[in-house]
From Swiss-Prot:
Catalysed reactions listed for this entry: (S)-2,3,4,5-tetrahydrodipicolinate + NAD(+) + H2O = (2S,4S)-4-hydroxy-2,3,4,5-tetrahydrodipicolinate + NADH + H(+); (S)-2,3,4,5-tetrahydrodipicolinate + NADP(+) + H2O = (2S,4S)-4-hydroxy-2,3,4,5-tetrahydrodipicolinate + NADPH + H(+)
Family note: Belongs to the DapB family.
Organism encoding this protein: Chlorobium phaeovibrioides (strain DSM 265 / 1930)
Role this protein plays: Catalyzes the conversion of 4-hydroxy-tetrahydrodipicolinate (HTPA) to tetrahydrodipicolinate.
Key word NADP present: yes
Gene: dapB
NCBIfam families per the UniProt record, alphabetical: dapB (TIGR00036)
Signal peptide (from-to): none
Designated name of the protein: 4-hydroxy-tetrahydrodipicolinate reductase
Lineage: superkingdom: Bacteria
An example Gene Ontology biological process: lysine biosynthetic process via diaminopimelate
Binding site for (S)-2,3,4,5-tetrahydrodipicolinate: 135, 144-145
């Protein structure tokens, strides 16, 4: 397969390294911040992999969708516009797969967290909270992966109703608040932990990224999967869709 990479930052370089090491894939083009993005620049590629920033992704979206080439993006920060993006994807008859984290390990963590959240839901003695650690260069907080994990908890445990990113200046958290704490420290690639606590027990579920290679490999695998579905099955997809098909 031939890939066009949008974004030439750390993740873009990591994805390029994964593709370069492959015997079956190649890079058609790498588009950096100075590139003029039109539908034509993507034609001849089998898939687009985008790792940019929120504003660049939204600015380039129409051209990527109009190209007819399936798009995989790991750019975060636009969750509040998900419905609008889904409408654009549908109107263009395009295929787009979005994930805040393409690491297969993280997605195993999220599935484990979903089951744990469901299991503790009937038992009021168990409380749950999230914490994420990333390097000091990461701009958004909580991370997209932490928000995905928090939404997994909310969907599986009705005792939690809302995400709280900061502690209140006075008073304390309500019982149905889900705290998502963020730490920015050194060069940490990414660590996400869920803490389940009661008077008698503590359960900790955690995933630590050792390098960016897991994110990059997962993005390439997801792009291969998406290209295999397009154009017969266009639409907006997630890593859950990818994994569900693999796992049956």
């Amino acid at each position: 397969m031939k890939f066009t990479l949008v974004g030439n930052g750390r993740m873009g370089h990591e994805v390029a390294s994964v593709i370069d090491a492959s015997t079956v894939h190649s890079i058609a083009a790498v588009l950096d911040i100075d590139a003029v993005i039109t539908p034509e620049v993507f034609r001849g590629s089998d898939a687009i992999i985008d790792f940019t920033v929120r504003d660049a992704f939204l600015e380039n979206l129409d051209a990527m969708l109009a190209s007819g080439v399936p798009v995989v993006t790991g750019t975060t920060g636009w969750d509040g516009l998900r419905e609008e993006v889904a409408v654009k994807v549908s109107e263009a008859g395009a295929s787009l797969l979005y994930s805040a984290n393409f690491s297969l390990g993280v997605n195993v963590f999220l599935r484990t967290l979903r089951e744990a959240s469901r299991l503790i839901a009937p038992f009021a003695q168990f409380d749950i909270a999230m914490e994420e650690h990333h390097h000091t260069g990461k701009v958004d907080f909580p991370s997209g992966t932490a928000l995905a994990a928090a939404n997994v908890i909310l969907s599986a445990n009705s005792r939690k109703q809302r995400i709280v990113r900061e502690l209140p200046e006075a008073g304390r958290l309500a019982p149905d608040d889900l705290q998502v704490a963020s730490v920015r420290l050194g060069s940490v690639f990414g660590k996400h932990s869920a803490f389940i606590d009661s008077e008698a027990d503590e359960i900790v579920l955690s995933h630590t990224a050792k390098s960016r290679s897991g994110f990059a490999s997962g993005a390439v695998e997801a792009a291969v999967w998406l290209a295999g579905r397009h154009p017969k099955q266009p639409g907006m997809y997630s890593m859950d869709d990818f994994l569900n098909e693999l796992l049956g």
